């Protein structure tokens, strides 16, 4: 079976094409569009510019799927559409222009599917899972391989930076402002922060950027998939520096995320401190794998079992 999954996110819109054969899932193609929908919010609604960006990406992906004769695909949206006050208008507009009606994933469901996806790549026992998107951050605490608590915070790398940063590069004062905003949101969860979770699992663009930047700056081996809390802290210190010699190398490694990098790293660093994490494992699997496993494979397998009975 070959199946396409389109993730309509707040910062990026992605297409993943999966092949399922002999009990194994293989990612055969991955496409990304930097849409920055979280920057297209005005008075709580998605603007015409944002709608046009979303429709452009969706029609592009429809063409890619059609060229490969892939008829089966699903489209879901996360904070990009769930947090706007003109959702129905936007959904109707997207349907009109693309023929697609995206499924809206709400926060807890997004966090759960993140966990399903990462569990396919790691033997999860105890730790914290974090998914920093453009418009939200999902957190999952798990013990003995099972979810203990999960939540979605409506603050992501892009909308946090939009709130606090006036220019392109964040100042030390703006970094402090972002820290205050994200810590207030974490406090509102009213979770028990007494227990330390040594291991964190990171998915999403900020986590991948953290690994990429750490490899370049700290001579971490190319095959390594983990970084430390010290790596993240040092990157934040570089980003908050007034010296261009300190912050420019960071942005140079990942220039496409210049408008969300500081926001994402502030969120990552503050969550690491809250839960006492020492090591961050970066997962290649995430929400799209979780969606494919939970929504598509499970349904297909259930239908097959029913047909046998």
What are these regions (language model features)?
Residues 10, 134, 205-208:
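Short, glycine/acidic-enriched loop or turn micro-motifs at the edges of active sites
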Residues 17, 40-67, 78-90, 96-126, ...:
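Helical "lid/coupling" subdomains associated with nucleotide-phosphate turnover
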Residues 29-35, 202:
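A structural signal for short, well-ordered beta-strand segments
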């Amino acid at each position: 079976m070959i199946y396409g999954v389109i993730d309509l996110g707040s910062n990026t819109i992605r297409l993943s094409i999966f092949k399922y054969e002999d009990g194994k899932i293989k990612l055969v193609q991955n496409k990304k569009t930097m849409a920055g929908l979280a920057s297209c919010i005005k008075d709580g609604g998605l603007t015409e510019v944002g709608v046009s960006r979303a429709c452009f990406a969706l029609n592009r992906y429809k063409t890619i799927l059609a060229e490969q004769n892939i008829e089966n695909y699903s489209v879901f949206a996360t904070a990009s559409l769930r947090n706007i006050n003109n959702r129905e208008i936007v959904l109707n507009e997207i349907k009109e222009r693309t023929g697609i009606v995206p499924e809206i994933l709400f926060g807890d469901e997004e966090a759960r599917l993140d966990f399903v996806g990462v569990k396919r790549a790691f033997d999860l026992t105890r730790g914290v899972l974090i998914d920093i998107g453009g418009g939200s951050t999902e957190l999952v605490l798990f013990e003995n391989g099972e979810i203990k608590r999960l939540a979605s915070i409506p603050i992501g790398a892009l909308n946090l930076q939009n709130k606090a940063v006036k220019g392109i590069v964040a100042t030390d004062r703006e970094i402090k402002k972002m820290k205050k905003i994200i810590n207030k949101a974490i406090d509102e969860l009213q979770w028990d922060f007494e227990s330390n979770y040594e291991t964190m699992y990171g998915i999403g663009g900020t986590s991948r950027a953290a690994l990429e930047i750490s490899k370049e700056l700290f001579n971490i081996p190319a095959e390594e998939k983990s970084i430390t809390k010290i790596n993240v802290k040092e990157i934040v210190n570089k980003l908050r520096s007034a010296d261009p010699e300190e912050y420019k190398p960071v942005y140079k490694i990942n220039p496409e995320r210049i408008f969300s990098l500081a926001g994402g790293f502030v969120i990552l660093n503050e969550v690491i401190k809250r839960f006492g994490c020492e090591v961050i494992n970066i997962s290649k699997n995430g929400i799209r794998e979780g969606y494919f496993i939970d929504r598509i494979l499970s349904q297909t397998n259930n239908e097959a079992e029913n047909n046998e009975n």
